[in-house]
Amino acid sequence: MVLLSKFDFFGNKAGEVELPDAFFAQEGSGLQLVKDYLVAIRANKRQWSACTRNRSEVSHSTKKPFRQKGTGNARQGCLAAPQFRGGGIVFGPKPKFDQHVRINKKEKRAAIRLLLSQKIQTNHLIVADDSVFTNSLTSPKTKEALRFLKSCNVECRGVLFIDDLEHAQNNESLRLSLRNLPAVRGFTYGMNINGYDLVSARNIVISEKALNRLSGHLISAMKD
């Protein structure tokens, strides 16, 4: 078992959270899996709708622009040739086939587990008590949210907040308080986590309930 400290809204230690050893990956393992997962995320965000017209598709007459000989110019066949303005494109992009990259659920969950374990091992993940997300603020106050980050010694740069979906009705004050901080990259929920968000974020603040539920979900996927 690995013990992680959890903090309250004032930066004081409020207990510990246990994570099984199976959650953590060995150093250097799974790098190719993570790379494939991130490439799939980036590729599937593209529209793949880029399309150009070649010389047979552009609207031009097939008449020769000038006679073959006697003008001193290089011979030309028609204005649809790619060297002319408005002519066709050579080797341009075409939506030839579905370029959606598939990755199965087991690979996705394994990649997310590897990324989370890396954040924990490099001390870039802070576990917050559930009260931080639900009962810490009665109204949105950006100043108080910033004070919480500083009290937990969180580097104010690229911070991602992760909460449990069951707290969605009670964490609005904190979400609105964080919205005006440039250092906060986003606010999401554990079961909706995206591996690209984990890579892009420098630091992660996660609620105890979200971490327990997410870790249990990811570990159970290893046994399937």
UniProtKB/Swiss-Prot annotation:
Cellular-component GO terms for this entry: ribonucleoprotein complex; ribosome
A GO molecular-function descriptor: structural constituent of ribosome
UniProt xrefs under SUPFAM superfamilies: Ribosomal protein L4 (SSF52166)
Annotated segments matching region Disordered: 54-73
UniProt xrefs under InterPro entries: Ribosomal_uL4 (IPR002136), Ribosomal_uL4-like (IPR013005), Ribosomal_uL4_dom_sf (IPR023574)
Keyword tags: Ribonucleoprotein, Ribosomal protein, RNA-binding, rRNA-binding
GO biological process: translation
Stated family: Belongs to the universal ribosomal protein uL4 family.
Subunit structure: Part of the 50S ribosomal subunit.
Functional note: One of the primary rRNA binding proteins, this protein initially binds near the 5'-end of the 23S rRNA. It is important during the early stages of 50S assembly. It makes multiple contacts with different domains of the 23S rRNA in the assembled 50S subunit and ribosome. Forms part of the polypeptide exit tunnel.
UniProt xrefs under HAMAP family: Ribosomal_uL4_B
Descriptive protein name: Large ribosomal subunit protein uL4
